[in-house]
């Protein structure tokens, strides 16, 4: 029992502090019904909730520059002003904005990049304007959008928005044309988990036979379904081809223009070092062999040159060849002089007196 009381007391003590912290983080500023034509610049930059409703603000370029000063805004209310168009990057610096209400203006044009930068936006109210058509790509930056209100405009056809977190969609009060052009939205409403607000009031205005039907339950003709299927097939093929072409183009562009990263630079350095080292080793091994081949080639060329020179000399001086031949023959001729007379013995043998004299001397 004491523990329970202590827990209640602790909770009661912490609750006021939590409320005070929340009140400290929220800084509201109410400038509604001030007859302003421009967004004031003297507001604290810490403002988180800004109400500028029921003025004469047009949200021109000057207003967009002033809005950039209030980057901490989480809620912005611009109802019942004189805004006729939303231009590209009108809210580009409001990175924390979660609620944007621009109902009750005269907006007829919404450029494709109007909501760039509103990545945290969760609720968007564009009701009671003069919007005729919307590019579905306009909502692409709104990845966290949960509530979209397009009530009371002049929209006749509308493609299914690519909003992954959308929960509530309000479309009543528009002159919907329930022909084949609206079949995609019709199928999307019946297959997605999005809740169509005021479904029984979101009625077809054309054709006459469908005026009492909701756009979600209207019976579309068989021709519309067949046309829709063929359109999906064509879109898929074109998307696949364009994706392949764009990917190949991006790959080519990247390979040609994208700077190499550190890993590529390191890899190139390693390869260059290995190639240079291999080249040096190859040169060190092959240099002696190449030197011997070059030396033998030079020696061979030298011998050929001497032989050619010798032959050329002989060809030019044939007389010298005869002289050299005569000289060589004289030098190599050996003339023996007969010092002793040979005596023919009775037995038919020739006696050499030189031998006999030597024998006599030996006997003596």
From Swiss-Prot:
One of its GO terms (cellular component) is plasma membrane. Glycans are attached at residues 30, 35, 46, 88, 177, 190, 193, 200, 241, 245, 250. LRR repeats lie at residues 44-69, 70-93, 94-117, 118-141, 143-163, 164-190. Residues 286-364 are cytoplasmic. Residues 21-264 are extracellular. Pathogen-recognition receptor which mediates the activation of TRAF2- and TRAF6 NF-kappa-B signaling pathways and induces the expression of pro-inflammatory cytokines. In kidney, prevents infection by uropathogenic bacteria by inducing the production of cytokines, chemokines and antimicrobial substances. In gut, involved in host-microbiota interactions, plays a critical role in promoting the recruitment of immune cells and intestinal inflammation. Interacts with TRAF2 and TRAF6. This is Leucine-rich repeat-containing protein 19.
């Amino acid at each position: 029992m004491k523990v329970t009381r202590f827990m209640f007391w602790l909770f009661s003590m912490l609750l006021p502090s939590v409320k005070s912290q929340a009140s400290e983080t929220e800084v509201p500023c109410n400038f509604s019904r001030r007859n302003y034509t421009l967004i004031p610049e003297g507001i604290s930059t810490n403002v988180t909730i800004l109400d500028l409703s029921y003025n004469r603000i047009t949200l021109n370029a000057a207003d967009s520059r002033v809005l950039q000063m209030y980057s901490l805004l989480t809620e912005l209310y611009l109802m019942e002003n004189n805004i006729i168009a939303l231009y590209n990057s009108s809210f580009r610096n409001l990175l924390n904005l979660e609620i944007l209400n621009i109902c009750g203006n005269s907006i007829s044009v919404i450029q494709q990049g109007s909501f760039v930068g509103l990545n945290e936006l969760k609720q968007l109210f564009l009701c009671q304007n003069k919007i005729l058509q919307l590019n579905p790509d306009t909502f692409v930056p709104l990845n966290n959008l949960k509530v979209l209100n397009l009530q009371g405009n002049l929209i006749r056809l509308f493609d299914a928005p690519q909003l992954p977190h959308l929960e509530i969609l309000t479309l009543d009060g528009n002159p919907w044309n329930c022909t084949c052009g609206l079949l995609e939205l019709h199928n999307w409403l019946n297959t997605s988990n999005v809740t169509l607000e005021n479904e029984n009031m979101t009625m077809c205005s054309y054709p006459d036979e469908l005026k009492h039907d909701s756009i979600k339950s209207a019976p579309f003709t068989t021709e519309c379904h067949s046309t829709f299927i063929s359109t999906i097939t064509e879109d898929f093929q074109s998307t696949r081809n364009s994706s392949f072409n764009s990917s190949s183009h991006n790959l080519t562009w990247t390979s040609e223009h994208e700077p190499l990263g550190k890993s590529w630079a390191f890899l190139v350095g390693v390869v260059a070092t290995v190639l240079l080292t291999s080249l040096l080793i190859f040169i060190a091994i092959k240099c002696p062999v190449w030197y011997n081949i070059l030396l033998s080639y030079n020696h061979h060329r030298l011998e050929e040159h001497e032989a050619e020179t010798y032959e050329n000399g002989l060809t030019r001086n044939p007389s010298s060849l005869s002289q050299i031949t005569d000289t060589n023959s004289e030098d190599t001729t050996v003339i023996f002089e007969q010092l002793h007379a040979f005596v023919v013995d009775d037995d038919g043998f020739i006696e050499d007196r030189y031998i006999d004299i030597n024998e006599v001397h030996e006997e003596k």
